[in-house]
Amino acid sequence: MFGYLQLINPTTDIYIKDYGNFSGIVAHQAYDPVRRDHMLLRSMKLHFGPNSKLLWLGDFHAITLSHANMIFGASSVGFKGVNVSTLPPDTLTTGIRPRPVVTMDFAQLKGFYSDLAQKEDYIMYFHDMVKFVSQTGGAPVSLRDVFLWISESVTGPVVIRTDCVTGCNNLWPSGSGHFYFPYERKTKFRYGTFVECGKNLTWSEGPQWDVKSYVVGFNFVTRANSLLGGGFDEVCYRLMMQAEVPRQVAEQGLTLEQAVRKLASEHHMSRPQLTSRRVPGITDQTKYEAYVVCGPFRTGQVVADSLQMAEDLAWREMLGTLKTLIHDEARQTKGCCXRCWPGELYLINIESAGFREGASAAAAYQAGFLRAFYGCLNTSVCSFSSLDDGLRWLCTRLSTKSIGAKGRTVVLFGCHSEGEVLADGFGKTYSAAEAREQVALSGKIGGSAQVIVVWQRCRESKLQRLLPELAMVSYVPEEVVAGFKRVRELETYPQWCLWLYRSMIESMGGIDVGVRDASPLTESGVVYQVEAAQYGMRTTRVRRADGTLDYQGLSWTSLLMLLLGHYGADQTYEALRVSSMFIRAREVGWRKRGTFSCIVST
C-alpha cells in the first residue's frame, strides 16, 4: 500500500466530483472499513519490519483489534480510543452507530509512551485526529503541540491518516511519503502520511498543494466497487492476503532458487529449468531476460538491467506461482477464519462443434463474475471434446494433494446423457454411477475440506417412457417447460443477476431455520454430488436476447458460490437442498415439484 499514491491517475480512473457521474449511494458501496484496516495493518508490518509493534490512537472496530493481534501478536499491540463495536446504534431503523469523538489525556499519553521499552519498534498510528486535553477534564491541547512533541520525543515510525479537504485540523503533515487509503467512502479522499522516525515529522499550516490539488473531490470507484468487478483495491487486497514470500525464504535460510526447487521436489513436479540471456539489440544500455519452467508452469519473460536481477525476478515469480497453487497450514492461518479461503471453482464442459457448443464460453463469462464476488483461490474453466479427457482432468485435480485448499471446491460438470449413461460427441460412454464413484474417490483422497459437484446432464427415464402408468414421479407437461424456457429467453443478464440476489436472500432465510448437520459428514474430505435436472427431466439451455447463455447448472453453481461463503460445513446439505428449489422454480415454476437427490461420500 505504501507508495501506491503515484499510481492514481484522475484522467483515467472513474471518479466522482461534487456533482459527478456516480451517485453517492454507488460510491458508498466502495466503503469497507474492515478490509481497509486489514490492508493497512499488514502494510505497516511489511513496511516497517517483522519486529514492529503497533500503538493505535482513535476509534476502532473489534475485528480490527482481532486482526492486529493476529498480524503483530497480542503482546505487541496497544489500542487507545473508543471501540465502536460496543456502541449502541443511534436508531432502531438504520442501525448506524454514531461517529464517536475520542478525547485523550495528553499527559497520560506522554507518560504511557515514555514507559514503553523498545520505543523505536512502535508504530504510532493516528487513525483520526483525536481531541487532546491537558488532563482529564482539562483544557484542550492544540494539535500543533502534539506534533511538536512527536518531532521531539517519538523515536519510532509515525503514520497519520489525513483528509484531503481538511487535513489534520488544517495542519498538513509530511514525512517520508504518502500512500493511498483503499476502500474509503463517498467523495472525500483520505491518504496516509508516514515517517520512519517521529523526530523527522514536519508539517505546514493552511492550504497546501502537494496532495490536495491532485485528489480533492475524487472518489476512485473503480478501486473498490463490486458493480465494476473489483478493481485496484481488490487486487491489492488479494496480494496482501497471500504469503509473504521473501520473508519466508529468509527464515528458511534458502535462496529463491533453492525454495522453488524444494517446493517442486516436495510436490512431485519436474525439475525447474532456468533460461537466461542477454537481450540482443543496439541500445547503449545492456538488458538481460530470464524465465523459469517448472512442470506445466512457465513464468513470463523477465527483463532487467543485470543478469542476477533478471534471474532473481524469474525465480521469485515462479515461487509466487507455486505458492498460489500449493496450500499449506502456514498459508491457511494467514486468514482470520476459514471463509477467508473459499477454495477452488472448476467449470468443466464436454462440447464440440454442434454438440453442446457455447457452454464453456458462458461458463467463462460467469467465472469472472463469481471470482469478483467470491474470490476463489483458483478458478478453472475447461472445455473438452472427449468425455475421457474431462473426467481424467477433474479426477487428477481433485486427487492431487498440492491443490488442497483446505476449503470447499465447487465443480460444475456438463455433458450429454441418455438415461443413466454419460456420452460425448464421439460415442464414448460411461455409466453415471461409475463416473460419480470415481469423482467421489478422487475428492476424498485430495486435500479439500468439502467437494460439491453439480452434474449438468439430462436425466430422462426409460422406465417412464415405456411404462408411464408405473412412473415413480409425475412428468411436468412439455408446454409448461416450453413456457418457462421462453421466459428465460426474454430475460437479460442484469435480470438474471437480480433473480440470483433475490434467490440468495430467500434461500438464506430457509437455510437459517433448517437443521444443522452434527454428523461425521462435517469432517474433512466429504464429497456432495447433486444433479441440476430433476429425475425424469431433460436439461434446457436457452440463449437470451442479449446473447448470453443460460442453463441450470450455471445458475445453481452461481447461487451456491454466493451461499456457501456464509455457512460452515454443518449447513452445506441444507444449502444444496434449499437452493435446488429455486433452480427448479426457474424450470417448471414450482419449487416443490420433483425430487432432490444428493449423494454424499465420506
Swiss-Prot record:
GO terms for cellular component: host cell cytoplasm. It is found in: Host cytoplasm. It comes from the Viruses. Keywords: Host cytoplasm, RNA suppression of termination. The protein VP9' may be produced by suppression of termination. This is Non structural protein VP9'. It comes from Colorado tick fever virus (strain USA/Florio N-7180) (CTFV).
